Amino acid sequence: MAMFKKIAAAGVFSFSAAADAAQTLRVGSLTVYAPFEYVNSQNGEYEGFDMDLIREIGRRKGFDVQIISMTLDGLVPALVSGNIDAAVSALTITPERAEKVDFTKPYLNAGLTVMTTKENAPKIKSVKDLENKLLCAEIGSSGALVMKRIPGTTVRTFNSAADAFLELNKGGCFAMLNDGPVNKYFLTQKASKSMNLTALDFVVSDDFYGMAVQKGNKKLLKELDDALDEMRADGTFQKIYDKWFGDVK
């Protein structure tokens, strides 16, 4: 399936990049993963670090970015089937995913860290302390993959990290592995203040994010990579990063 659609009044599609009308870029994203992608409850708009990145890429490359909200484990199948053109959703580059889709160069190393209750925190000094434990995870996440490799663990999966945090807070599991920036950001939010959770500082493993496209779509892949390179070179990437993570310590 073609990866771009040019909107025309008669509904006719064209691949001409030189045309006046913007090309629609259908971007799949899990929009409940602040601060990377989420829905602003005040105006209903999709916001976050990834959303700012892809919209800036769209501005530079002439795309009309259309965000399509979906589950994390639905992103790769949607790319394979051609229902979306790109996946931009704090998506970890893994060998399993790379067999089915193509990734840009990594644009962020989030790093997996441990979220647990304040009572359990002193008991966890390394990954070994998670062995033979009941753990929580977001379904389809890199954290879930890593936890399943820890000897003796049972991993309960949830539709979102927020749901997993709630279960962890209730004592439904011992701990969870999740992207470090998300753990830290969550603990700065009002919703977490009445919860008994804390994030540990040590990084369990690297967690490199990439934007994904349908296998073999070299044209779009190059445009995304080129735009990210340009944004790093001119300081735009750093400005967007500081906007979302500058106050997250």
Question: Where on the chain are the PLM-derived regions?
Answer:
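Periplasmic-binding protein-like
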Residues: 31, 109-116, 180, 184-225, ...
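A conserved helix-loop-strand patch within extracytoplasmic ligand-binding domains
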Residues: 63, 91-93, 105-155
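Short helix-initiation/N-cap motifs at beta->coil->alpha
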Residues: 51, 67-77, 122, 156-170
